[in-house]
Amino acid sequence: MTDSFDYKQLTAHLPPPVFVPLPGYLPQTPEAMLASAEQFHADMARRRTTRDFSTQAVPRRLIELAMLTAGTAPSGAHRQPWRFVAIDDPAIKAQLRAAAEAEELKTYRSRMPLEWREALHPLGTDHIKAHMTDAPWIVVLFAEKFGIQADGSQRKNYYVDESVGIAAGLFIAAIQMMGLVTLTHTPNPMAFLRELLGRGANERAVLLMPVGYPAANAQVPDLQRLPAQAIIQWNVSAG
């Protein structure tokens, strides 16, 4: 093909894209924008991964809103390849915990290399996962590797990991803004989650997130976030 080739000819058989006015945009003054941004940063700066949960009930609507917020994430070709499964049934949570602890015990005993053990040591983790039954909710995030169309054929999804990662971030932010806490738990391996929750072969478990209120005596590791100069650069080029 030459440089003059019109690539739009390749989709000429499809109807033209449909566009609508940008919905819901609300202009703000620079002062209001700065105040909102600073408040959001302050709220998120208080976020900590938490393993000590209260058993206090959390309304289902809050969990639903967090998942719906996650569903507003951008995605490759707008495929929206995320699927959330929310569980508050004590029997199912106990089943998930037993399966997770069985896998984690194998990991801590023999699968985990020394470098990984040393990296996890400051977090004080082990194979006991009480948070899975203490927290009132468990939300499992699955990535849809490919879609299944009405005729049973596969539909390719694009940038699945990136899209699902963004959705996870929005979910975590929503939980934080509600005054709840969560933990991004990644049992290794995670195939048991798909099997126990009856998900399709086209889905892959990405995160298991207990959600709830922190326990009255909740503690977190004494860790520090990287300073701005370590994670941000301005106008840097190789030239």
Regions found by a protein language model. Name each.
Residues 2, 13, 80-164:
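Glycine/small-residue-rich phosphate/adenosyl-binding loop
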Residues 2-32, 36, 126, 207-239:
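C-terminal helix-cap and adjacent tail motif
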Residues 18-26, 41-56:
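Generic N-terminal amphipathic, Lys/Arg-enriched alpha-helix
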Residues 59:
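Conserved, non-catalytic sequence blocks in retroelement Pol enzymes and Pol-derived host proteins
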Residues 67-70, 139, 145-196:
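Small-aliphatic-rich amphipathic alpha-helix that forms the alpha element of a beta-alpha
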Residues 69-71, 122-127, 193-195, 218:
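Glycine-rich, charged/polar anion/phosphate-binding loops
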Residues 71-78:
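Glycine-rich phosphate/pyrophosphate-binding beta-alpha loops
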Residues 104-112, 198-221:
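A glycine-rich helix N-cap at a beta->alpha junction
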